[in-house]
């Protein structure tokens, strides 16, 4: 299972999951998925509703991570069961 890295926004309503795309066919570049979602109800009671998925080259995903951190997003661990 691939390792996932999670960010949560400052008001704890949105979540992003960064994960490496191990099924990528490109021989020259590595890619990551960025899944975005909304937190429903109380954080930790239900898994987030994942709404979108992007696939970016790793260096662009790192840029996105840094941009989100600068905007106040924080690293978090999932507090819900794996789904």
Where are these regions (language model features)?
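Terminus-proximal functional modules
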Residues: 1-83
């Amino acid at each position: 299972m691939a390792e996932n890295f999670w960010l949560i926004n400052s008001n704890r309503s949105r979540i992003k999951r960064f994960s490496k795309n191990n099924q990528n066919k490109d021989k020259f570049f590595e890619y990551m998925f960025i899944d975005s979602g909304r937190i429903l109800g109380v954080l930790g009671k239900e898994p987030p509703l994942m709404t979108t998925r992007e696939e970016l080259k790793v260096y662009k995903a790192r840029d996105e991570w840094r941009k989100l951190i600068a905007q106040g997003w924080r690293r978090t661990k999932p507090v819900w069961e794996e789904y």
